[in-house]
Amino acid sequence: MATMAATKVPEVRDVTRIERIGAHSHIRGLGLDDALEPRQVSQGMVGQLASRRAAGVILEMIKEGKIAGRAVLIAGQPGTGKTAIAMGMAQALGSDTPFTAIAGSEIFSLEMSKTEALTQAFRRSIGVRIKEETEIIEGEVVEVQIDRPATGTGAKVGKLTLKTTEMETIYDLGTKMIESLTKEKVQAGDVITIDKATGKITKLGRAFTRARDYDAMGSQTKFVQCPDGELQKRKEVVHTVSLHEIDVINSRTQGFLALFSGDTGEIKSEVREQINAKVAEWREEGKAEIIPGVLFIDEVHMLDIECFSFLNRALESDMAPVLIMATNRGITRIRGTNYQSPHGIPIDLLDRLLIISTSPYNEKETKQILKIRCEEEDVDMSEDAYTVLTRIGLETSLRYSMQLITAASLVCRKRKGTEVQVDDIKRVYSLFLDESRSTQYMKEYQDAFMFNEMKTDTMDTS
C-alpha cells in the first residue's frame, strides 16, 4: 500500500511594524525658507508664523554655536503646538547636534537625586567630536596565497597581493590576518581596506574589471572603481559621543555595559571634573571640539524650587547646552513653595529666558492639521467629514479631534467603506466623550459615583 508523504505548510506570522505613528511623527522641520520666513504650511508645520520665525532665529544661533548656555521658554495654551515647534527644531538640527527631550516629571526618581537626573540630561545634550588619524591600506586584491603545513599542525602563512591604478605590492600574512581574510571571504577582485593599527578588514565591493567573472550575482554585490594613488593612506576618522556616555564609561569597571542596560546610577563629581579637564585638553590640542546641543524639558512647571535653583547655576557653566522649556500654565504656584509666579517659574529664572508664545489655531489651520494627520495615518476622508471634524476640534480640542481619526477609520473599514464619511465621525463622537461632555455627565450623576462627598452623620463610629 502506497503511503503519501504529508506536505508541511510553513506557518506565516504577521510581524508588527516597529515604526509607530506618534503624535508628532508628521513633523519634518520648522518649515522656514532661506530667509527664515515661515511658510504657511510646510514640513508638517501649520500656522504659528511668529513663533516659528522666533524658533528659526534660535536655530540659526544654535548651528553657529553662539548661544550655548541660553534658555528659551515656549508658552501657550494646551494644543497650540509647543511640543511640535520643539520637535521641528530637533528635526532641523539633524543627527549631528545632540537633542535630548525629557518631561518635567521624569527627574523625580527614587534611584537618583533630582540634580543628578538634571545633570545627566545636561551632559547628554553636549556632544564631543573627536578626530583621529589612522593608517590604512586600500587596494584591489590580485591574489591570496595561503600555505598550510604538510603535517596539518602549525601556523599558517601566506601572501596577499594588492594593487592600485599606480602600484602593486605583496604583503606577508600571519595567522590572524589569514583568519580575518577567511572570515570576510576575501577573494581576488575584491576591493578592501585594512586598518594597520587594529588589523580590521573591510570589504568595499568588487572591482568593475571583475564584473564578468560570474553570470549571476546577489543584490548585495557592489561594484567600485580600483583605488588610485598610494596603497598606504592616512585617513581622518571622526567620532561623535556625548559627555554623558564618556561619564558612564569612566564611572566604573566595564562601564560601557551600563550604556546598554541603562543602569548608570549616580556618577561622582570627581569623574566629571577629570573628564571636563581631559576634553578641554583635547580641545586645546585640536583633537576634539565641543558641540553644544539642545535640552528640551516639556511640562517645566512640574519642576520644584530646588530644580529651578539648579538650572540657574547650570546655565552659567561653560559646558551648558541650549535649554528649551515648554509650559501651558498661567500664573500658578511654584512647586515646593507657597508663592505664585507666571508659568510656575521663579522670577529670577524668567529673567534669563527668551519667551516664545503660541496662539490658538483658527478654523483653516485646524482643518489643514487634520488633513496632514490623515495623510500620516493613511486615512481617506471626505470633504464633509473634514468640515465636521474641524468643527469638533474648534468646539472641543485639537487633540480630541485628532484621536477620532483612527477610530473613525476603523468604523469605516468595519462597514466595508474606503472613505470616512460624516456618519462615521458622528458615531465615534457619540461613543467617545470629550472633556466638556464628560464633565457635564459627572455633574449630572455625581451622587452615583463612589467617594464623591462622604457624609459624616451617616457613619457609624461606635
Curated annotation (Swiss-Prot):
InterPro entries: AAA+_ATPase, P-loop_NTPase, RuvB-like, RuvB-like_C, RuvBL1/2_DNA/RNA_bd_dom, TIP49_P-loop. Its EC number is 3.6.4.12. Its main location: nucleus. Keywords: ATP-binding, Cytoplasm, DNA damage, DNA recombination, DNA repair, Helicase, Hydrolase, Nucleotide-binding, Nucleus, Transcription, Transcription regulation. GO terms for cellular component: dynein axonemal particle; Ino80 complex; MLL1 complex; NuA4 histone acetyltransferase complex; R2TP complex; Swr1 complex. Forms homohexameric rings. Can form a dodecamer with ruvbl2 made of two stacked hexameric rings. Is a component of the RNA polymerase II holoenzyme complex. Component of the chromatin-remodeling Ino80 complex. Component of some MLL1/MLL complex. This is RuvB-like 2. It holds the Pfam family TIP49_C. ATP binds at G76, Q77, P78, G79, T80, G81, K82, T83. Belongs to the RuvB family. One of its GO terms (biological process) is DNA repair. GO terms for molecular function: ATP binding; ATP hydrolysis activity; DNA helicase activity. Has single-stranded DNA-stimulated ATPase and ATP-dependent DNA helicase (5' to 3') activity suggesting a role in nuclear processes such as recombination and transcription. Proposed core component of the chromatin remodeling INO80 complex which exhibits DNA- and nucleosome-activated ATPase activity and catalyzes ATP-dependent nucleosome sliding. Involved in the endoplasmic reticulum (ER)-associated degradation (ERAD) pathway where it negatively regulates expression of ER stress response genes. The lineage of its organism: Eukaryota, Metazoa, Chordata, Craniata, Vertebrata. It comes from the Eukaryota. It is found in: Nucleus; Dynein axonemal particle. SMART domains: AAA (SM00382). It catalyses: ATP + H2O = ADP + phosphate + H(+).
